[in-house]
């Protein structure tokens, strides 16, 4: 924040602590969970923090800084009204409102993202917990879109109104509905013969390949540039997860997002709990294998683990 006052917020990466060896609140060794659900979320976090947010920050399109790991300029936050109490997506909403306030005042500003700085969180280990979390994220995104709908395609807000906000609407409002309709209409088209099976298969494969390439690229970026995995076995596990997530996990997330839309339409404001197993003094779900890579990289991963409020992550 030591600049000319234009920098109003800075965010960092959040990594998955499930499967890591934790001692007295510190990460001693980085590991990967035995369970598939946390592994899929690990890939998802890599993709969100190392691809999407880095790119959006560089293009001045960043709308979200995770509430658990962000720093805000106090005067800008207070001037915008601080955190709202009537939304379930307060981290997204407050940054949108801060940037909206700066645009309306005609003041230059910046929002930065530092991928090399990270904290660690425990992600949901059950489908019910993941469902509750993603339902609330989706509901919070819709609340923010409607609260600040005057920004949509409004040149007064520059890139924020002309690019960032339309992208948010496309991803969080139209995206789940269109993808669900696709899963429904493709089988119908195949049954009634107005869709070529080859086209349907090719379209599905292209979607999976694109998702896998994005996930694999994020994993390689993390491996080569930031915080490598402790063992080759763990890296292979994540690489496999980046492929398998396209077959079931992704579709399940879309159902949870549709559930979030339904909760919004019903006016549901409840904050559904996400069960936590806890990471205190954990030795990790997997035994961290002693190999040459682990010996060289243990110290660099010693970082404090703090329990994050539910909702921090790759939305």
Describe the role of every protein-language-model region.
Residues 287-288, 293, 297-298, 302:
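N-terminal helix initiation/capping motif
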Residues 1-118:
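Internal catalytic domains of large membrane-associated glycosyltransferases
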Residues 155-171:
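Membrane-water interface at loop-to-transmembrane-helix junctions
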Residues 113, 118-132:
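Catalytic cores of eukaryotic secretory-pathway lumenal/extracellular enzymes that build
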Residues 129, 133-147, 238-282:
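Membrane-proximal soluble regions of multi-pass membrane proteins
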Residues 298-315:
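Long, low-complexity, intrinsically disordered segments
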Residues 167-265:
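Membrane-embedded multi-pass helical conduit in multi-pass membrane proteins
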């Amino acid at each position: 924040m030591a600049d000319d006052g234009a920098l109003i917020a800075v965010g960092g990466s959040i990594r998955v602590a499930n499967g890591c060896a934790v001692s007295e609140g510190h990460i001693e060794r980085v590991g990967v969970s035995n369970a598939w659900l946390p592994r899929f979320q690990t890939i998802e976090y890599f993709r969100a923090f190392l691809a999407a947010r880095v790119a959006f920050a560089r293009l001045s399109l960043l709308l979200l800084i995770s509430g658990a790991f962000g720093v805000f300029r106090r005067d800008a936050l207070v001037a915008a009204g601080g955190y709202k109490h009537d939304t379930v997506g307060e981290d997204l909403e407050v940054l949108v409102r801060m940037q909206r306030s700066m645009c309306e005042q005609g003041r230059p500003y910046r929002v930065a993202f530092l991928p090399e700085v990270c904290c660690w969180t425990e992600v949901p280990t059950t489908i019910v917990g993941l469902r509750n979390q993603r339902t609330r994220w989706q509901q919070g995104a819709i609340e923010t879109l409607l609260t600040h709908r005057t920004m949509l395609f409004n040149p007064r807000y520059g890139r924020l109104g002309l690019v960032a906000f339309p992208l948010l609407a496309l991803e969080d409002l139209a995206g789940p509905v269109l993808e669900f309709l696709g899963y429904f209409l493709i089988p119908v088209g195949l049954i009634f013969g107005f869709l070529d099976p080859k086209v349907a298969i090719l379209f599905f494969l292209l979607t999976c390949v694109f998702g896998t390439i994005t996930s694999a690229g994020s994993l390689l970026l993390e491996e080569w540039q930031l915080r490598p995995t402790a063992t080759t076995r763990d890296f292979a596990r994540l690489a496999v997860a980046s492929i398998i997530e396209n077959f079931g996990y992704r579709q399940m997330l879309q159902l949870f997002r549709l559930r979030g839309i339904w909760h919004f339409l019903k006016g549901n404001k409840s904050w559904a709990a996400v069960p936590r197993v806890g990471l205190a003094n954990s030795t990790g779900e997997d035994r961290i294998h002693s190999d040459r890579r682990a010996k060289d990289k243990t110290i660099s991963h010693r970082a404090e683990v703090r329990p994050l409020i539910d909702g921090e992550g790759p939305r």
